[in-house]
Amino acid sequence: MNKFLLPLVALAVLASPCAHAQNLDAQRTAIRTAIDNAERGQFDANATAPLRNHPLYGWLEFSALRRNIDTLPTAQAQDFLKRYQGQAVAESFRSAWLPALARRQDWPTLQANWKASNDPGLRCAELNARQATGKADAQWTSDAQALWRGAAKSLPDGCDPVFAVLASRGGLTPALRWERIDAAADAQQPAVMRAAARGLPAAELAQANDYAAFVDKPDARALNWPKNERSRRIAVDGLQKLAKADPGAAELQLPQYAQALGLSAEQQGKVLYEIALWTVASYLPDSARRLAAVPESAYDERLHEWRTREAMARGDWPAALTAIRKMPASQRNDSRWRWFEGRLLEKTGKPAEATALYRAAANEPTFHGFLAADKLKQPYTLCPWNPGDSAAAKASVARDPALVRAIELFKIERPSWAAREWAEALTRFDDSQRRLAVEVASNNGWFDRAVFALKGPQELRLYNLRFPLHHDDTIRREAARNALDPAWIAAEIRAESIFNPNARSPANAMGLMQVLPATGASVARSIGLSGYGGASSLYDSDTNIAIGTAYLRQLMDKYSGLPYVTIAAYNAGPTPTARWQSQRPNYDPDFWIETISYKETREYVARVLAFSVIYDWRLNGNALTLSDRMVGKTEGARKAFSCQSAP
């Protein structure tokens, strides 16, 4: 065992909890500071000598070497790869070093240190290396052609020399160029189509550029295209792309191209599918008509759902029921559609037929399954699984060097590096060890591993791992302060950040409850939060929960105390929420949620409400009914949980 693991593992047994925590904190601060300094070009080998046996010392070295990657001596780089062979840090270094070797055209060294990769840039670097060292043999040609034909999208600039040599040797035949043009057309990449066409004979080049122009923006020149299968496929590609931006224009243009080029019913169906999809996704007035124009053979699960939602949004209950019954059995038997089939039977005067559907749905611990249990006035179905793993097995997994490094990297806020070490550890683990690794990670506050690494129906019953209890005191305090249910606050945190206080979204939402800086500042002022220091304060868990919970309270007051509308506004913002309210002002909550046009928000509202039920169970052993919870009733009867058929 690495000597430095003694403080990390043995002290957990030998030292007092307080001393152990202080020791670990000091070690983490030291390695974090050293890595930060190395990235700034301030690596001092003598000053960091005491860290040499730290599990993360390789990442410290990596940070220092990467800083000077373009001038790094080969011997030093190869020594690093040798010392850390088999570790994630070695492959991370290799991925940084090989492009540097390509930039300085050190082709022999690149070849000597090459390791198979799916990264197109690295593959091109290796092909350049082989070509430059006189190894552009038949295998080289085959490999270069495989890279070409598999690239529907643009490739890095480093690939241009590869394809130039391939073309000069006759390896980029017109047929191969057309193969990539076709792939790029399917991917709706007109610029790639044009680039791939260069080198075609003049007449073919003109036709290829015409095809690319059509995919970019359909025009009447296509009416005079050769009446062949390629023309038909590319016409479909271009019309599908147009349908996303302007479904009405695509609908108007389809008939003329269908007639001129002889589009098959299947090909026309693909375009009609996109026209209908991008119409109904915004509930435009022509939605029902355009959905009806799509052949049933062109429907997939996505469009089946939208046909059902569109009828629901119009309040056409018979049409919605018919739409569900046209779904394939595997889709129709999902708890969501069983629930809505039952609800629609009730709305069309057939309540007796709904009971069996509710019974089937109620067997699943989902949003719609919980609603079905409410309908039947029966306990919620929840079957926790206890694998009964031994402490020795867990301790063995916890000692895995890659897992130790992964957790330590997580602790010092290096999530991408932590994920690489985690992936490396999992390559050696069987299913039970993987499950135990999730438990070890959760015990160290790395809760999202339970979301990303647990698999299959049985592991999804590990509710203690999937729904962690953390920051309980703060959640309860802020929930009480704002007259909200703590289970709801926990569910929001679980849905927003999986209890990661350092989470940051592409939209710059920050912390546990993913609060935007502008919202944070506004809410902090409105509640008189002392000590709020700007956006960085949102990474403080107590501050984030205080602001996020107060913001939920403000939204609740704005939306008449209705949690399901409040949750939608928390995710999507006030403008779309106001639009959905005005479009369907008197809808039952379940139908209102299902007809939300944003997929993310539609799923988010149902997820948070279902998570609230599970967190209520975790906190209290029973739960407020979901039917009451959705509409803000907090004093109703509470419901027990039962397991009908757990193995």
PLM region descriptions:
Residues 22-30, 52-59, 71-73, 85-94, ...:
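Generic helix N-cap/helix-start motif at coil->alpha-helix transitions
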